[in-house]
Amino acid sequence: MKRRKLSARRRVRTGSALFLCVCALAGAALWRMLAARVTMPPEMGALLCFGLPAMIGLFFIDGIQLRLVPSRALSPAQTLWLALTGVLAVCPMTLLADVLGALAGRFTLPLAAATAGAVPTAVLKLLVNDALFVPLFEEGFFRGYVQGALACYGEKRVAAFVALAFALAHGLSMNLPGLFLMGLLLCALALRTGSLLSSLLVHGLYNATLVLLSCSGLGALFDGLTPLSCLLRLLGCGAFAYAMRRAFAAKGALPSQESGLHLEHRDMLWLGAALMSVVLALLLSRLMEVLL
């Protein structure tokens, strides 16, 4: 009887995860359509499409499920090699996108054209959004909730599914294969280290590197298939492979007595109130911009 109840609960959690995943992907697609017509705070999209579903899945829809979140501490060696992996991931990702773009007869939008010459305040805003908010909400949803909720289907299958959902959440483009591979890497890191911090660190530093390259004007060195660009990125690919190998091989910190995060109901309410406060603040700021 007990085994049957556990099985039933697992099916409910799996269905909930799939439902929230569909909602997140649909919300991301709708947000891209709205953002193309109406100026909206970029961090609000990540919050509503991924942060809110993660919170619903971890706290409400099936009760408190924080034990799904991999929360083992990282060792200094892991942190170092993971940080280098995130920074150097720009090389294989941009090279793959350019090769696929060339095969398709066109190139992707150059990094240098996106935000080159941006003022420092704009750079800081981009860094806060792309290197903090977006990785936090996306990793919390995909690697923190969905990957744990679907673990009963096997690590490899779930990693492939989560990576595909992660790639589709960014839209259909020449970057889709690269985003899928990045999703696989982030899933593998979370599984190997037993810590969501690993995928969060790599994701955040990868995004931060893209922003800094774009704003500094150095993004031109990572675009196109010129000899210099290809040579530079091929060397970077070698360094990326080495850093990734060391990150997987590095020994983790000693695990704590309890695996998973544990919050009291009062802490959960405070967290929910904080999240809702952020949502209201973003909505009010947008409303004030429209009115004034």
Where are these regions (language model features)?
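Alpha-helical membrane-inserting segments
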Residues: A26-A35, I56-I61, P92-A104, A169, ...
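Alpha-helical transmembrane segments
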Residues: R13-A29, W81-C91, W270-L280
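Hydrophobic alpha-helical transmembrane segments
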Residues: L25-A36, R67-T79, G101-L109, L172-L185, ...
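Juxtamembrane helix-loop-helix connectors linking adjacent transmembrane helices
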Residues: M40, L66-G140, Q147-C152, L283-L292
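Membrane-helix interface linkers and caps
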Residues: K2-K5, T39-V87, C91, D98-L109, ...
